[in-house]
Amino acid sequence: MVNSGSSANLLLLQSLKNLKKIKTGDKIGFSALTWSTNLMPIMQLGFEPVPVDINLKTLNISPRNLIASLKKDKIKCLFLNNVLGFSDDIMAISKICKKKNILLIEDNCESLGSEFKGKKLGTFGFASTHSFYVGHHISSIEGGSVSTNDAKLSDMLKISRAHGWLRNINSNKRKSYIKKFKINKFYENYTFFDLGFNLRPTEINGFIGFHQLSYLNQIITNRYKNFKLFDKASNLNNAFNRLDLRNMNFISNFTYPVMCKTQNLFQEYTKKFKKDKIEIRPLIACLLYTSDA
């Protein structure tokens, strides 16, 4: 656990860099429709960001989009954002990455609990990140996490989460580091072994988040029920584009996207929503990588 989903993204990339899975200057692909802190750590840590276009019917990178992007840019890593609780054919994307020797990691901050063909989003890549900010599937007020089944990455995440020291890894691994680098026992608690930050959560954030895990299934089930209601109503209106989510067998969405077919319809419905005091916002965020900044 870390202090935010944004920190989870930063920590994951730094830990992969520490392990030499990726290096400064490597090209990292990311979804053209994403949150700012899926992109920003890529830039901040010295990688080259490569936006990959999305399929408007799924709002996510499709295998076709990825293949088209690979013809122009040879990426070392794909930081795939599972947008708003959905995915395209992530199984096919995983196979492409494996074939091309591309490291696949997932930003699953908007999709906790969603399943593609019976497999949870967030379990297709080498690691995945989650956010527990207010409004997400579970909330610890502020918080996030990184998940992986790789022991070396797990240790490095714990090291880099807390300054670069060893205090949070198990004693046997800690001893092996101390022996390898010949660290004097007096200094071992204050020796920093790799690049890191202080991204630790507070005890109260951890307590609140842990408590909500006991009814996570209830939360995501209710989200799926709500999604079906919104989707049914939206599909009755010819002004909106329909989503194609046939391969999603469980949808734990973050919000419901309404996509108008024309700019005029967009302006019309924006006014209607505001008049009826219904909160609306962009699907995620503006296209930051096109900004002069």
Give the predicted meaning of each segment:
Residues 1-27, 41-43, 51:
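Phosphate-binding glycine-rich loop
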Residues 32, 51-55:
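Short beta->alpha connector loops at strand-helix junctions that form conserved
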Residues 5-6, 64, 68, 77-81, ...:
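PLP-dependent aminotransferase class I/II
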Residues 46:
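Structured binding elements
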Residues 41-42, 96, 204:
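Hydrophobic/aromatic ligand-binding patch that stacks against planar heteroaromatic rings
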Residues 33-39:
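Conserved coil-to-alpha-helix start sites within the AMP-binding
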Residues 57-156:
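Active-site phosphate-binding strand-loop segment of PLP-dependent enzymes
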